């Protein structure tokens, strides 16, 4: 098994908290946090994955959140957490987003007040967009355009939620790493191409982005996106456990 996602837990496995999980093939799953309260040295099965599928995102939710999934096609779907019923650890989950065979989910977000969507494509172009431009609809659809994946841009390779003061790290397939302030990325509309964020060499491709959050003065261990820190739970790709 490979570690697919890692999160921090401070809610002491409360029965009113859930782990929401999304996979590359568009599956979404919600499981009560208490189901993971007794970890084993070999790990616990978190989701039953189809062959070739893998985990792309996890978060802790409380029954009141919205969920956003973003695909390599540059599309996004936003739906209420209550559209996903709670199910056991070994269940497969339900369809979160309908994808064409050549596309994958690349990110899952839990929209928060004050957050902006950062979307960056393979050729180094990207943008920030107000989350209010993405209305809440039912799960399972093909989604709406979050960024144009034109020939200039290439496919969407990274998406995250940014807050004031955050920085971002951009990483290419040739090992180039650029750190920049998120506030310097242009805020533009949903159905646009964005602007150049990182200049790449010929045949060089952007492969990953990472958000570097501004610590909170009140609680430096608390993230804006629901992954609060105290102890760690590792969700691994399932074994025969």
Indicate where each model-derived feature is located.
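Intrinsically disordered, low-complexity regulatory regions of eukaryotic regulatory proteins
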Residues: 9, 202, 222-223
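Acidic, low-complexity intrinsically disordered tails
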Residues: 213-235
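Single-stranded RNA-binding regions, centering on S1/OB-family and related RNA-binding modules
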Residues: 134, 142-143, 147-148, 185, ...
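Conserved structured catalytic cores and adjacent interaction surfaces
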Residues: 6, 10-144, 153-177
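Short, small-residue-biased leader/transition segments that mark boundaries at the very start
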Residues: 1-9, 236-239
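Short alpha-helical interface patches
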Residues: 82-85, 183-186, 240-241
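Positively charged
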Residues: 72, 97-101, 144-152, 197-217
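Positively charged, low-complexity, intrinsically disordered RNA-binding extensions
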Residues: 165-218
């Amino acid at each position: 098994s490979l570690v697919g996602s890692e999160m921090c837990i401070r809610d002491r496995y409360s029965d009113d908290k859930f782990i929401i999980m999304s996979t590359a093939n568009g599956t979404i799953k919600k499981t009560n946090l208490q189901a993971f309260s007794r970890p084993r040295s070999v790990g616990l099965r978190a989701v039953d994955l189809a062959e070739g599928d893998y985990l792309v995102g996890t978060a802790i939710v409380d029954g009141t959140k919205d969920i956003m999934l973003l695909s390599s096609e540059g599309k996004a779907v936003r739906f209420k957490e209550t559209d996903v019923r709670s199910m056991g650890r070994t269940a497969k989950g339900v369809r979160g987003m309908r994808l064409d065979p050549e596309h994958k989910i690349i990110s899952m977000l839990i929209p928060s007040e004050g957050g902006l969507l950062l979307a960056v494509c393979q050729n180094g172009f990207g943008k920030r967009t107000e989350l209010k431009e993405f209305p809440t609809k039912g799960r399972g659809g093909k989604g709406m355009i979050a960024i144009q994946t034109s020939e200039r841009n290439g496919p969407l390779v990274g998406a995250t939620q940014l807050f004031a003061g955050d920085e971002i790290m951009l990483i290419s397939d040739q090992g180039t790493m650029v750190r920049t302030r998120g506030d310097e990325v242009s805020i533009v509309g949903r159905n646009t191409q964005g602007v150049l964020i990182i200049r790449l060499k010929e045949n060089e491709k952007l492969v990953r982005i990472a958000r570097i959050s501004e610590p909170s003065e009140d609680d430096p261990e608390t993230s804006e996106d629901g992954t609060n820190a105290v102890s760690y739970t590792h969700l691994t790709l399932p074994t025969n456990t």
